Amino acid sequence: NCFATPYLQQPLKHGADIVVNSSSKYINGSSNAISGILTDSGKFKWDKNRYPGFADYVKYGPMAFVAKLRNSLFRNMGACLAPVNAYLNSIGLETLGLRMERECSNALDLASWIENNYPDIKVNYPGLCSSKWHEIAKKQLTNGYGAILTIRVGSKEKAFKFINSLTIPYTLSNIGDTKTLAIHPFPTLRT
């Protein structure tokens, strides 16, 4: 989960067994470390017959998944966070609540302003009552509706004209840091 962060959404409370979060985005907050977080509820039943790859780990009970990850990823592939990246993430984590509160508030204000002042532009933001995702977002998100909103202006050409007319946002593809971004998804996601 890149967009909601653990501050806004706690999937374990909604029945998820394992949660994957990118800590390179909002948790870090400065785009200066690449990392992720795996959270295991410990509730999944790792039956060794159904999941033969876990046969050696079922003895660890609720820690079976973590034990396998530690053995497979850490030992065999070296997937260990560098100490400096852990430090940089911890600095960002200290201000996550405040940053998400402000960014969610700004996103809602901007989405509302666009929706109220530009009826020809379609705004997608789960915090808007007009959003088809609003009711789901109210149930699943706490402390805000996220800092990402999308708009539809009608065509790729109009989108680039709109983006190029902006003066404050950067045209970058890394979300979740200290910069306000305006990007078009097609060229960004297909490069």
Could you tell me what each predicted segment is?
Residues 100, 119-191:
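Conserved C-terminal alpha-helix-loop-beta "cap" of PLP-dependent enzymes
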